[in-house]
Amino acid sequence: MTPEHLPTEQYEAQLAEKVSRLQSMMAPFSDLVPEVFRSPVSHYRMRAEFRLWHDGDDLYHIMFDQQTKSRIRVDTFPAASQLINTLMKAMIAGVRDNHALRHKLFQIDYLTTLSNQAVVSLLYHKKLDEEWREAATALRDALRAQGLNVHLIGRATKTKIELDQDYIDERLPVAGKEMIYRQVENSFTQPNAAMNIQMLEWALEVTKDSKGDLLELYCGNGNFSLALARNFNRVLATEIAKPSVAAAQYNIAANHIDNVQIIRMAAEEFTQAMNGVREFNRLQGIDLKRYQCETIFVDPPRSGLDSETEKMVQAYPRILYISCNPETLCKNLETLSQTHTVSRLALFDQFPYTHHMECGVLLTAR
């Protein structure tokens, strides 16, 4: 695979290899055959980052080969959304001959939605002044005149200039209901929107007929919390990143959801609070004992759950675990399988044509 060519003819074989690999990894814990959720074979990535290469008068996007570290020119990127591909051409055309926009520009980041909105961030090794703002405003207006719903941001050391806003609003059809998700520039969002829809619908399906409340750790912008709210009496969710918490609060209001409470704290801190080890001012007014959480949802970073959180989640009758790294999932399962069994297993092909796998397991208490 190269940035400008996807081996779409190999998609089925690559997916089959992942299914086999996941099944082998999970064999010590389950004999379930994974439920498999396929990605679109192209234009599946909703965000992308590129370095910029200045070559005389020419200017173009580049990526680096992971093995050789050699530079690869990228004029089209079929893994990314159609909108990103359109913007790549438009941004180069708009920046190449404009000194204020081109000088010391070293990277462009693209964030798009299925609803055809975009935030484009230009990163510089220089101070951004009024001349830059005027040139960027003219470029934004020219892009919008082409029918592109785009917002531009300039970034430099200790500087961030938003011409309008630093977010876009995604609209996803999830099990018969449209969900609105505010996505903030430079914050985590699910990269493969089509796969995100399938993950949300799978999580809804495996938690239907749930009793009690849901606790979620690492909730981000509320991606799973808000979709799952319809299956539970109440949802209590934690997140540490301020922009993600703000986006989650917006998303709660935008989706007219009244049974989700977001707390800004790390999963490790919340574990201490739940165990009565420490008290936190951020929890004033929230009576944790009122929540009857029968299910806990975790979508941890690649490192998986730490040992204290492992112990905490074992106290819940059901654990829904979305993993971006099956190796650390299996490490966690060495502990979790002492008290729980794997009742559902899914493979989500979030990153086609790579060795990366995303998977989901539902664990039920023995």
UniProtKB/Swiss-Prot annotation:
Binding site for S-adenosyl-L-methionine: Q190, Y218, N223, E239, D299
Molecular functions (GO terms): rRNA binding; tRNA (uracil(54)-C5)-methyltransferase activity, S-adenosyl methionine-dependent; tRNA binding
Catalytic activity from the UniProt record: uridine(54) in tRNA + S-adenosyl-L-methionine = 5-methyluridine(54) in tRNA + S-adenosyl-L-homocysteine + H(+); uridine(341) in tmRNA + S-adenosyl-L-methionine = 5-methyluridine(341) in tmRNA + S-adenosyl-L-homocysteine + H(+)
Pfam families: tRNA_U5-meth_tr
UniProt keyword annotation of Electron transport present: no
Keywords for the protein's UniProt record, in alphabetical order: Methyltransferase, S-adenosyl-L-methionine, Transferase, tRNA processing
Gene3D superfamilies on file: 2.40.50.1070, Vaccinia Virus protein VP39
Disulfide linkage: none
Active-site residues, record numbering mapped to chain: C324, E358
Assigned EC number: 2.1.1.-, 2.1.1.35
Family indicated by similarity: Belongs to the class I-like SAM-binding methyltransferase superfamily. RNA M5U methyltransferase family. TrmA subfamily.
HAMAP family hit by this protein: RNA_methyltr_TrmA
Protein name per Swiss-Prot or TrEMBL: tRNA/tmRNA (uracil-C(5))-methyltransferase
Naturally occurring in which organism (per UniProt): Salmonella paratyphi B (strain ATCC BAA-1250 / SPB7)
Taxon lineage: Bacteria, Pseudomonadati, Pseudomonadota, Gammaproteobacteria, Enterobacterales
This protein's encoding gene: trmA
